[in-house]
A protein has these predicted regions:
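Acidic/glycine-rich phosphate/pyrophosphate-binding loops and surrounding catalytic core
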Residues: 2-228, 232, 244-249, 255-257, ...
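Small/polar glycine-rich anion-binding or flexible loop at a beta-alpha turn
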Residues: 260-266
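Active-site loop ensemble at the mouth of alpha/beta enzyme cores that anchors a bound cofactor
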Residues: 293-297
């Protein structure tokens, strides 16, 4: 069973297991959106203008620097559209740094299928590469500190595991995958439970092997969470002086996570206070796609 204290390796393994189930479903949903509600390439009426027996060779390039992510989603798009009739040749792997004008992969197959799958495939890889690229910028700023970058549950609907995978490819780590794999006790939970101690004790009783995290908004609440035995304590909207004081008070009794008011400009300053984790919702909420293009040869 996983340890109660947060374990990035366990979270990673759980995510990769979920991904195996989620990719086919996510791709099928995206294709249905594009093809009139069913995964049928014949519903692309513009592609029907091409001869049925026409075959083409295309290459996908990046127009800007970044970090690549999304290989399996691209493969799944063309598997669902054409089975083995499309051949993909890869020049990069997930997590690779890419530079402007670099070829990423090549596609050989029926011209109609290549055109039908183009936008769906690029939507996935541009979105995931955009997240991985942004995460890498944050991770690079943490170099030399012991602080680890975490994502959050603030993800685009339907793309939770995909976006969290992109965070891994960028060098970050995953917070909770969902509501079932860790406790995160916030203000309303505490009010409804009666106290921090009561909430934490109930969590330990319900699932002794699951991490228990408590969100606090003051140093007083921090001390209450420590006394209750929380594994992880989230410092919500603390300033840097409060963060340093929290590190002194905690003395390794729990892991500390910073959340709120985190930007690429404040990240390093927060990390240098000595906290264990910094979580950033914007990584998977404010997504900027990487600029990619597919060109027929």
């Amino acid at each position: 069973m996983p340890p109660r204290r947060y374990n990035p390796d366990h979270r990673r393994d759980a995510l990769l297991e979920r991904i195996n189930l989620d990719i086919p479903n996510a791709v099928a949903q995206a294709l249905r959106e594009d093809l009139g509600g069913e995964v049928d390439a014949h519903n692309d009426i513009t592609a029907q203008l091409l001869p049925e027996n026409s075959h083409s060779h295309a290459v996908v390039i990046t127009r800007e620097d970044g970090v690549f992510c999304g290989k399996r989603w691209v493969e799944e798009v063309f598997i669902q559209l054409a089975g083995d009739d499309v051949t993909l040749t890869w020049h990069v792997a997930d997590g690779d740094v890419v530079t402007a004008d670099q070829p990423l992969f090549e596609i050989l197959g029926p011209s109609r299928v290549l055109l039908t799958g183009e936008r769906t495939a690029l939507n996935f890889v541009q979105t995931l590469s955009g997240v991985a690229s942004e995460v890498r910028k944050y991770v690079n700023l943490l170099e030399g500190t012991h602080t680890q970058l975490l994502d959050t549950r603030k993800t685009l609907p339907g793309l939770r595991t995909a976006l969290k995978y992109a965070v891994l490819c960028g060098g970050g780590a995953n917070h909770r995958l969902g509501l079932s794999d860790a406790f995160l006790i916030k203000e309303n939970h505490i009010i409804a439970s009666g106290s921090v101690r009561q909430a934490v004790e109930k969590a330990f009783w319900l699932h002794p092997d699951v991490p228990v995290e408590v969100e606090v908004e003051s140093l007083k609440e921090l001390e209450e969470a420590l006394k209750a035995g929380a594994d992880i304590i989230m410092l919500d909207n603390f300033d840097t002086e409060q963060m340093r004081e929290a590190v002194k008070i905690t003395r390794g009794q729990a892991q500390l996570e910073v959340s709120g008011n985190v930007t690429i400009d404040t990240l390093r300053e927060f990390a240098e206070t000595g906290v264990d984790y910094i979580s950033v919702g914007a990584l998977t909420k404010h997504v900027r796609a990487l600029d990619l293009s597919m060109r027929f040869r």
